[in-house]
Structures are given as C-alpha cells and as structure tokens.
C-alpha cells in the first residue's frame, strides 16, 4: 500500500502548487479562525479549483456546525473532512450521512489512555489521524509543532487506515514511520518558516524524505 503524504494548512497558490508538483497525495485547508492557517471561503474556493483533482482536498474543521460545513462544502467541495475537535461518534456519523464524504478523525495523544476512544471512532471514521495532544492553554488543537511518543502506537491493533502528525519534519519523518508503521504522514508547522507561512523548499524536502522511507521499506520487503 502506498504511503500517503499530506501537506496541511496551505494558504497560497505558490505553496499549493509546490505541494502538488512535489507529489503530495492530500492537501489540507484549514477553516478555523484561531489558526494562522485559516482560509476564507473565497480563498478556499480559489485554491480548491487550483488542485484540479491532482490530490485529495481535505477540509480541516474544529467542532464546526452544519451551516459552517455547508459553506465549506459549497466553496471547496472537499474529498475528505478532517475533524480536529471534540466531535462525538454520533457527530461523525451525522456528517458522513449529510455530506456523503469520508471523515478522518484526529485523535490527540499524550498517553496510552488517549487511545481508549479508538473503538468508538473506528466504527464510523474512514481514517484516524494521530496528533500530539495540545497543552490545556492552547487556542487550537493542532499545528503546534510538538510530537507525541510514537512508541504508544508501536503495538497498535487498528483495523482502519491511520496517519500520524504532530511535530513532523524532514529529519524525523523516517523515524516516525518506522516506529508507528502508519500508512500516511501529515505535516503543517514542520514545513513552515513562521506560523502559517509555508516554505516551498521545506515542503519538497519533507515529501522527498517521506518517499525515500517508503522506497527503502519496499526494497527491504522484496529481498
């Protein structure tokens, strides 16, 4: 199975084009005002058109209501909704039924106890995204540049695709994949020169590093 690489929090035509040209499988757009990566609906519409089916469009939301999701659906027509708040299993089910789109549920991780929610979410979600749990005083749940203990996923038994995020960058993505055996990686702050400012060279370096890990793994498997 091919590794999925997601570049999240894209907000300019230049950096989106860089991610697409470099081979990102998923491009993420943030619709959450407290985030420095938040997009207006108008910009989301423009960037969505630019993607033009070259990657999967992911709309990141945090405890959004139906009206907000309706507007995002109209502007971006995302391929996937990434739910990064405290959405319940019932809420995931409602969103899937209302919009007919897959949902990826972010699960914040700090200790093994945080994994107790997985059976409930796994019954409804199409994919799980493991992210570092934000500090209690944080104004947003992700994109903070902090990793979690990847060894918590070392013996994970989850019959569902999952990705990892949180503090990833070109220099540690190989280690994250080796430990977690995740089917995908998601990066935001790890390809930025400042909060919300994506760096084209860092985007390309991250995707190269992730792909190199995949290539090395495939080479070992055929020996």
UniProtKB/Swiss-Prot annotation:
It is an enzyme of class 5 (isomerase). One of its GO terms (molecular function) is phosphoribosylanthranilate isomerase activity. Pathway: Amino-acid biosynthesis; L-tryptophan biosynthesis; L-tryptophan from chorismate: step 3/5. GO terms for biological process: L-tryptophan biosynthetic process. Its EC number is 5.3.1.24. Keywords: Amino-acid biosynthesis, Aromatic amino acid biosynthesis, Isomerase, Tryptophan biosynthesis. It catalyses: N-(5-phospho-beta-D-ribosyl)anthranilate = 1-(2-carboxyphenylamino)-1-deoxy-D-ribulose 5-phosphate. Pfam families: PRAI (PF00697). CDD domains: PRAI. InterPro entries: Aldolase_TIM, PRAI_dom, RibuloseP-bd_barrel, TrpF_fam. Belongs to the TrpF family. This is N-(5'-phosphoribosyl)anthranilate isomerase. The gene is trpF.
């Amino acid at each position: 199975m091919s590794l999925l690489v997601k570049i999240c929090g894209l907000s300019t035509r230049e950096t989106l084009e860089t991610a697409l040209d470099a081979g990102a499988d998923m491009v993420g757009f943030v619709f959450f005002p407290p985030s420095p990566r938040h997009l207006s609906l108008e910009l989301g519409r423009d960037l969505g058109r630019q993607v033009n089916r070259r990657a999967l469009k992911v709309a990141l939301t945090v405890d959004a209501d139906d009206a907000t999701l309706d507007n995002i659906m109209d502007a971006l027509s995302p391929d996937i909704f990434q739910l990064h708040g405290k959405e319940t299993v019932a809420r995931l089910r409602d969103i899937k039924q209302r919009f007919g789109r897959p949902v990826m549920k972010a699960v914040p991780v700090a200790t093994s106890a945080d994994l107790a929610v997985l059976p409930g979410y796994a019954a409804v979600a199409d994919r799980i995204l493991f992210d570092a749990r934000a500090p209690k005083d944080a104004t947003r749940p992700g994109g903070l540049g902090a990793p979690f203990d990847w060894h918590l996923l070392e013996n994970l038994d989850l019959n569902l695709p999952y990705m990892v995020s949180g503090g990833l960058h070109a220099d540690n993505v190989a280690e994250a994949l080796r430990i977690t055996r995740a089917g995908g990686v998601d990066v935001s702050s790890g390809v930025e020169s400042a909060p919300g400012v994506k760096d084209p060279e860092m985007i390309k370096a991250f995707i190269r590093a992730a792909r190199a890990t995949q290539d090395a793994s495939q080479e070992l498997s055929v020996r």
